[in-house]
Design a protein with these regions (language model features):
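Non-catalytic pre-domain segments flanking phosphatase-related domains
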Residues: 1-9, 26-29, 33, 212
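Conserved ATPase-coupling elements of RecA-like P-loop NTPase cores
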Residues: 16-20
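Short, structured coil segments at secondary-structure junctions
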Residues: 62, 70, 176-178, 232-233, ...
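Active-site phosphate-binding/coordination module
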Residues: 22-125
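Mg2+-dependent phosphoryl-transfer enzymes with acidic/Ser/Thr/Gly-rich catalytic loops
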Residues: 1-4, 21, 191-276
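Short, well-ordered alpha-helical microsegments
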Residues: 46-50, 165, 226-227
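Conserved acidic, metal-coordinating active-site core of Asp-based
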Residues: 99-220
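Active-site metal-binding loops of divalent metal-dependent hydrolases
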Residues: 9, 43, 222-223
Length: 276
């Protein structure tokens, strides 16, 4: 019997306007009545995730958890300090940062465990994309030495052409990404986490902590950085606007897009039939 549904945020649980469709809210409230946990799982920081969910009825997240930084951290809802956290070595982040400076036209986000997000070479278009759901601090120059003793969780490159980001990934010196898990998201991000850290590892860690069989979990997503979670869960569901690579490894592609509210189909196809 399904006990937990984990979902990506952007372009999956949230519509393209970064709002939660009412259909998702109604479906989650019914899921909670049936005893199923709702767990947001995002590449974003915990605080950014909670800000996007601030208008949800409290019952949606009561007693639940949040997987952030692509599995790098797990928080209890309402607690800023993570109960599970991975750390990315400063030297690795600095190496990637220096390469971004060398390239010249690549932007970068650097995420601290405390939830601060530092941006380098950020365009106005990127600021507009992030407006209302992520607060970005702009780096003061071409150095991140001031972050040397700050616990870091992940970083990513920003470029608004995913094909060119894929080309960049293929042509980069392998030493730059040694010891890292990499993925792509939102049509604009090339993401870096410590090896073994992804949304799938985060879901497995949370399920184990809660004593839930991974087969009794459902994951929802739309893009490459969701694929490990889609494969780890008992059922992997993608929205109709999912990328082809995510669709290919999913168990079920919903008719609903992120703007419609995919949780209605999750509820009707997988959860309610077990309670009849």
């Amino acid at each position: 019997m399904y006990q937990l549904v984990a979902t990506d945020m952007d372009e999956t649980f949230l519509g393209h306007d970064h709002a939660v469709p009412q259909a998702n809210i109604d479906a989650i409230l019914r899921m909670r009545e049936l005893g199923v946990l709702f767990v947001p799982a995002s590449g974003r920081a915990y605080g950014s995730i909670m800000n996007s969910l601030r208008n949800l009825p409290p019952a949606c997240l009561e007693g639940s958890y949040v997987i952030s930084y692509n599995g790098g951290c797990i928080n209890r809802v309402g607690e800023d300090k993570p109960i599970i956290a991975s750390r990315m070595p400063f030297e690795v982040v600095e190496r990637l940062f220096n390469h971004a400076v060398f390239l010249g036209d690549i932007g970068m986000h650097i995420y601290t465990q405390a939830g601060d997000i530092w941006g380098y070479n950020i365009t106005q278009s990127e600021l507009d994309y992030l407006a209302g759901h992520m607060d970005l601090k702009i780096l003061p120059g071409d150095s991140i030495e001031f972050l040397r003793d700050v616990p870091l969780s992940k970083c990513l490159y920003v470029y608004e052409n995913l094909d060119l980001l894929h080309e960049l990934a293929l042509t980069m010196d392998p030493a730059l990404t040694e010891g890292l898990s990499t993925t792509f998201s939102s049509g604009r991000y090339y993401e870096f986490n410590p090896t073994g850290v992804d949304k799938g590892s985060g879901l497995r860690a949370l399920a184990e902590m809660l004593g839930i069989d991974i087969a009794d979990t459902i994951a929802c997503g739309d893009s490459a950085n969701d694929m490990a979670m889609l494969e780890a869960a008992g059922v992997g569901v993608v929205v109709s606007n999912a990328t082809p690579d995510a669709v290919a490894i999913s168990d079920y592609q919903a008719k609903a897009s992120c703007d419609d509210g995919v949780f209605v189909e999750v509820l009707e196809h997988f959860i309610e039939p077990e309670h009849r």
